[in-house]
Amino acid sequence: MTSFTGIWVPIVTPFKNGEVDLPAAQKLADELINQRIHGLVVCGTTGEAAALDEIEQAALLAAINEVSGHRCPVAMGISGSSTRTVAEKVKRFNRHAPAAYLLSAPSYVRPSQQGILWHFQAVAAQTDTPIIIYNIPARTGVNIDAATIAALAQDERFTAVKESSGQLSQVKDILDSSRLSLLCGDDALLLSTLMLGGHGAISAAAHIRPDLFVHLYELVQAGRNEEAAELFNALLPLIRLLFSEPNPGPVKAALAMQGKLRETLRLPMTPMSAAGKDKLAPVLQEVMDLQVETNSAALLAGRAKFIQDVYGSTASF
């Protein structure tokens, strides 16, 4: 059974000549998995899902599933304004066997909390696949209140929440009122969320030096909070720059600087500005040069326990 903890990466969608570049996506996914991330999400906000048609989304999910094998769970982002349309899409995507659906509140229409509750329940009725509740009010126009999340948590199909409200008070309310794994969706609040008892993150910034984000998570799990804070402070300037312009422009700029993909986005999303890239380049280099000790006995023991809990084996990967 998939464990919705640790560092998950909402993988960007590479493009070539205007089309989805599946080989580049697979190569990037393989590199991320080899850095010991705990999960991937395709067709999330960072993956420009709104600019992909359903055929492209299905092909991307299949390609990432193929390269991940059993090394890493792959969740699928699902969003839309119409409950019927979203439910029908989930029903079609069940055959592609994602590890979970990352499901946001209906965008633009701004339903009541009752409407949000019924929306999630109606979509969940179409699948046995676990659902991660995605709260991102800055994009949907509506917050999913902690009480609504607690009500949804009564249904076993809801297993986690990606919390992107930017409010630590809501993080605490969710942790106090539901059984769900809480995954931080605001990278600038990653350390604070983990310190409050959060279970991990779905982190766009973790495209860059994913090993350091995994190490940060492991440090907190091992109770080495001072070291975790020191590492997070070293990552924070990069995190801020990666969200200084609309996501995923800066993330793709950073990956392009490393030669990992073309810096191409689909309209209406645009590449990072030249001024932004001038600021990003030296900070990116500092993070790429950062060296930390990641193989202490305590961390290795914690890593082995995580692998045992999730995969039923103490073999590393």
Regions found by a protein language model. Give the residues of each.
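Active-site beta->alpha loop and helix N-cap motifs at the rims of alpha/beta catalytic domains
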Residues: 2-141, 151, 294
